[in-house]
């Protein structure tokens, strides 16, 4: 398979060289689909040069990362290329790398989705934001993603949701300010490559992919 912008080894090397590795690169990772092994306190303080509440959960940290990514993207002029911004803006590249380390088990498939340009937002109604997406590999293979109600129709999402005991932990209070997790009440919202790709595209919706 031919590699695209976000999956090529040379592109990843250039991104690594254009900005220092974030603190998150030192954290351990497991195969658990709910993201373990992240020191929330240290990572929160390192994130975007901002001091966050030491009690921050990984969910709130990821939300802050995505919000910061979106803020940086919105500062760019129209028709700015995502790939160019990643190579030229150190702060943006650092945010991108932080996400790639946190989601190490899902990053490559999500980047393949971005490269294929197979995912797009569904039509919006008045007052809606970009939360409903569709990934279409071919006419017989469509996946629906909803970032508000935190759902994906793919088999990976269903498997991860029911395979993780932490999906059934005591629910957390709903926080409308958190980007990651939507209305899901779990401390560790279920992850799949489609959810990740859609979340990144929503944050960078004004950039040229």
From Swiss-Prot:
Which residues fall in a compositionally biased region of kind Polar residues? 1-30
InterPro entries for this protein: Znf_SWIM
Q: Which GO terms describe its cellular component?
A: cytosol; nucleoplasm; nucleus; Shu complex
Q: Which organism is it from?
A: Schizosaccharomyces pombe (strain 972 / ATCC 24843)
In the record, what terms sit under GO molecular function? zinc ion binding
Listed GO biological process terms: recombinational repair
Q: Its principal location?
A: cytoplasm
Outline what the protein does. Answer: Involved in early stages of the homologous recombination repair (HRR) pathway of double-stranded DNA breaks arising during DNA replication or induced by DNA-damaging agents.
Q: Name the source's superkingdom.
A: Eukaryota
Please give the name of this protein: Zinc finger SWIM domain-containing protein sws1
> Transmembrane ranges?
none
Tell me which residue ranges form SWIM-type zinc fingers: 143-203
